[in-house]
Amino acid sequence: MKINFNNLEDDEKMELIIRKIKEDDYQKVFVLTDIHGRFDLFEKLIEKIDLKKEDLLLILGDSCDRGKFSFELYNWYEEMIQKDYNIIHLMGNHENMLFESISDENFRLNWLYNGGNVTIK
């Protein structure tokens, strides 16, 4: 189900997607959060859990900032989704700061202070 908030100003528009997840649809369900650009540790974890296409990887946000490898994380997610892996990534407060920082100077300073400075290096 998609809910559009079209009554907001253009720069405030949001889309809410509500999706029912039935755990019986997957062999295993893995839930991760706050990876913060640590692709090096994430790779080790994925190897250890031996993620399969029949599994679900649910990421509760905050993949970016603080660690040096935010781009690599999002790139990995995209590649695995293209290979038909079941990956759902929710927007965390760090993703929100990143997007808000594009058009809002106050958010930009807050984002940089909270680890965005490492992301853009």
Predicted features along the sequence, with ranges:
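Active-site neighborhood of divalent metal-dependent phosphoester bond hydrolases
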Residues: 66-121
